[in-house]
Every structure is written in structure tokens, then in C-alpha cells.
């Protein structure tokens, strides 16, 4: 080890001596809260298939006429696109909750979402309703995941409002 390297280590050791127990507790609390938040967000991606499938199914049950008209979700192709997009949207919301990187909203998959539904003949009101149902299910999933955790849960209200905000941004792309 060189002299300069050992001096650097000694200097860092002296700096660490100035860290109080309160600072260490604050750091531990920050790490625990961040880990809990990541666990909650991870539950969204783990349940994305079920959330998307349930939302599409619920929308069809609410709109029986949507499966009987000319512009319907009656084909396998249209249904698979809705399910695929639902899962993609949930992953995008998860990414936004972690990174808050708004550039993902300008990506082609979201910019062309409205055009895709129009080309397939999927009524935009139905697509919007699916995303609203997904938002509600995601928030419910977040609440149940966080409530089963031990420790501080103060981050939940911020996480829920941020989730609602991100879904609203995506829903507004369809309007």
C-alpha cells in the first residue's frame, strides 16, 4: 500500500468518527424505507399479468355490448393486444415509480398506443376503462403488500399518489 493510499484511508477513518449514532439510524431508516418501497413496486411487476387480465375481463363484463358490436374485443388478436399493453403499462408505471424518468412516456410504444387501438377497432373508452381498473387494482395491491410489511409505512401515501399520477398521465395519452 502506498503512503498516499494509507493517508487517504486514515483521513476517511477520521471522517467516519464524526458520524453520530443518530446519523447511522437515519441512514438505516432511509435504506429500510427504500427497500420497502422497492418491494412494494416489485409486487406490481410480479402481479402485472393478473392485474391486466382482471382489468380486461372486468371491462368486458361492464360493457357486454363491446363484445357484440362491430367494433369489439371479440377477436383473439384484439384481446391479446389489450393484455400485452396492460402488462407493458404496468411495467412502465413501475419504472416511473422507481426512476421518475419521464422520457419513457415519449417512447413509441406509448405515443402510438392510441393509434394501435384505433386501428384495431378497440373503443378508446374501453381502453381507458381498462387502465382505470388497472390503476385501482395496482393501488389495492400496493396497500396489501405494504400492510403486510414490518416497519415504517409512511411512504405508502406518497407511493399511492405517485401511482395515480403516473396512470393519469398514461390515460391522458389516450384522450
From Swiss-Prot:
InterPro entries recorded for this chain?
Answer: Globin-like_sf, Phycobilisome_asu/bsu, Phycobilisome_asu/bsu_sf
Q: What induces it?
A: Constitutively expressed at very low levels.
Post-translational modifications reported in the UniProt record: Contains one covalently linked phycoerythrobilin chromophore.
**Gene3D superfamilies in the record:** Phycocyanins
Biological process annotations from GO? photosynthesis
Spell out the GO cellular component terms annotated for this protein, sorted alphabetically and separated by semicolons: phycobilisome
Residues holding (2R,3E)-phycoerythrobilin? 82
The annotated subunit structure for this chain is: Homodimer.
Q: What else is known?
A: Prochlorococcus does not possess phycobilisomes, instead it uses a divinyl-chlorophyll antenna complex for light harvesting.
Concerning its family, UniProt says: Belongs to the phycobiliprotein family.
The name under which this protein is listed is R-phycoerythrin subunit beta
Q: State the organism of origin.
A: Prochlorococcus marinus subsp. pastoris (strain CCMP1986 / NIES-2087 / MED4)
Its organism's taxonomic lineage begins at:
Bacteria, Bacillati, Cyanobacteriota, Cyanophyceae, Synechococcales
